[in-house]
Regions:
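Positively charged, polar, low-complexity stretches
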Residues: 1-102
Length: 102
């Protein structure tokens, strides 16, 4: 798993930023495919904070998929509401960071 500890205040800040985002990546009937993770990496590298929408998954499946995405996608699962989940990965290059956490 991506090991970057966030404080409660930082997670609250990121959830606030995430409210205005549209879902960047969608998980369909195919589940967590290599193509999904390629898209996930592309969007995380560009934006750092993304929303993932679960199209064909019930509540239990969504609860199981979100930690798997965080683990395999090397990112942090911030929160889930309904059929969407919010993920964050800070860019290792300080010059390319989109979101500054304090």
């Amino acid at each position: 798993m991506y090991d970057f500890p966030l404080t409660g205040a930082q997670k609250t800040f990121l959830r606030g930023l995430g409210q205005t985002l549209d879902a960047s990546v969608k998980v369909g009937k195919g589940g967590l495919t290599p193509e999904f993770f390629t898209e996930l990496q592309k969007h995380l590298n560009a934006r750092e904070l993304i929303k993932v929408r679960f199209v064909a998954a019930d509540r239990d499946e969504r609860a199981a998929l979100a930690p798997q995405i965080a683990d395999k996608g090397r990112c942090i699962w911030i929160s889930s509401v309904g059929a969407t989940a919010l993920f964050f990965r800070q860019n290792p290059d300080p010059a390319r960071r989109v979101i500054e956490l304090t």
